């Protein structure tokens, strides 16, 4: 089905059903083009109001609704909320890219319906495993960081209003990347010194964008500080632990966790248990210990009942958390029980929903 779609409703992955021309009749994009972020930006900069989209052949993409359609275990209402949030974040990102600011009401449209749904789903491990299959695009990354920040804030005892603000700061922490060259937005590997210097500016860009758009200094500070580390090794200001805002400490833990969960260039990926171990170790120096401990101690009980694959090739189920070594639980394989705290040569490779 071919539809005439307003430019504000166009999504990455949509396919043009006709050539797109600017107001002077100069061709911009050809029929059949699968729209990328840069393509949509081009159309917006030429002030096109509507384009022809072939909805019978919409391509999948990181930010499209199909990003979560392949997750059968996800409840329909939650899936719809995530789809809507991804689309809204794209609108927010594009508005920032083309206008240098974004509408405050977009952030509420992004958050309100989603947080109502995820708050009912207390098993954060299952939620993160559901989202694990999504592409590691800026949009989905920001969504995951915002969700995990919301959980951590609640575990630390923050009020519902504070949890909302911390979650919003998590969603917006990378909004400054809208001002980066497209090749750098997703953190290109092996950047040269010049590229790395430009990439690191996204923290300041984010601060400026949020202040211009929301006039919210705390949310802006989170965007500015989310790469600061407690030992002074971060950027842009090389702050130490006590100089980092409490909200930033939470978002930084969530951001680090989600970053560790991405697929590496060689196709490898760290398992959930290994990621939790790495976060735990960072809590002694770079990350603040309170949000780290909240993450570890609240996620660990959610591992009980999950199916796992061990690095010896066997599959089993976690039946008991080990309170003295949270990363080495008791696993049942058929009639046999394996205490990983004692059999330390065996490790959990992967956790399943």
Could you describe each region identified by the protein language model?
Residues 61-198, 211-213:
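Acidic/His-rich, divalent-metal-binding segments that scaffold phosphate/diphosphate chemistry
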Residues 131-134, 186-194, 223-224, 247-248, ...:
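Short alpha-helical linear motifs
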